[in-house]
Structures are given as structure tokens and as C-alpha cells.
Amino acid sequence: NLFQFGDMILQKTGKEAVHSYAIYGCYCGWGGQGRAQDATDRCCFAQDCCYGRVNDCNPKTATYTYSFENGDIVCGDNDLCLRAVCECDRAAAICLGENVNTYDKNYEYYSISHCTEESEQC
């Protein structure tokens, strides 16, 4: 769920998720449209695509099992849907961590009205 994802983000980026990523670019946060603005926003676009492939549970509210082991995020559910959601969040958190140097304050609280270009395909 989004709280668990926020915990993963904090572990991988050192940034508090709500303030840094809840309304960032065209895809970080609830929903998304247009073209991702930078590498950080592309991480969120990829997560949205991943969520789109998870059909049997609600990715933003599903509670899954995970742990941190030697700095790695380890998903632990036997339930395939919950594990898939965890893996989507895990991949996005790792991506955000790998691209933390591209984080641009100009895209914080970015208005969705600027996100008018055609979206890439998942």
C-alpha cells in the first residue's frame, strides 16, 4: 500500500515520500497523464504501468509483506497478487533511489495541467 511504499522510498532515497514524491511531475502521486518529465517521474510512470498489470487486488491499498535485508527490499508474500504489488513498489523505490540525483524541485507540486503531451506506451 502507499504507506509501505513510502517506507521503501525513505529507505532507498532518504527522502520523506509525502513531501518529496506525492505530487511530483506528471506521474508521482495519484493518477498520471502526459509524458514523464524526468528520470524520477519515469520511475513513477513505470510503477503505474506495473500496477496496470496487477488486476486482482488494489495496488494502492493492498497490504503486503516485505522486509529490509542488508539494504535490499525483500517481498515476502505467498499471495501472488500481493507479491506482484510489492514487486511494483520495490522496483519503483529502487528506481527512485538510483535517480535521486535527477530530482528537480521544479517538478514538486507540478500541476497536471502541464502534462498535456501524449503519454508513452507502457
Swiss-Prot record:
GO biological process, one term: phospholipid metabolic process
Top-level taxon: Eukaryota
One MF term in the entry's GO annotations: phospholipid binding
GO cellular component: extracellular region
Alphabetical UniProt keywords: Disulfide bond, Neurotoxin, Postsynaptic neurotoxin, Secreted, Toxin
Subcellular location: Secreted
CDD domains cross-referenced by the UniProt entry: PLA2c
Main location: secreted
Disulfide cross-links: C26-C115, C28-C44, C43-C95, C49-C122, C50-C88, C57-C81, C75-C86
Expression sites (tissue/organ): Expressed by the venom gland.
Its job: Heterodimer: postsynaptic neurotoxin. Monomer: Acidic phospholipase A2 homolog that is non-toxic.
Family as reported in the entry's similarity comment: Belongs to the phospholipase A2 family. Group II subfamily. D49 sub-subfamily.
PANTHER family reported for this sequence: PHOSPHOLIPASE A2 FAMILY MEMBER (PTHR11716), PHOSPHOLIPASE A2, MEMBRANE ASSOCIATED (PTHR11716:SF9)
Assembly: Heterodimer of A and B (AC P14420) chains; non-covalently linked. The A chain (acidic) is non-toxic, and increases the toxicity of the B chain (basic). The A chain may act as factor stabilizing the complex structure and hence retaining its toxicity by preventing non-specific binding. Upon binding to the target membranes the A chain may dissociate.
Protein's name according to its UniProt entry: Acidic phospholipase A2 homolog vipoxin A chain
Organism: Vipera ammodytes meridionalis
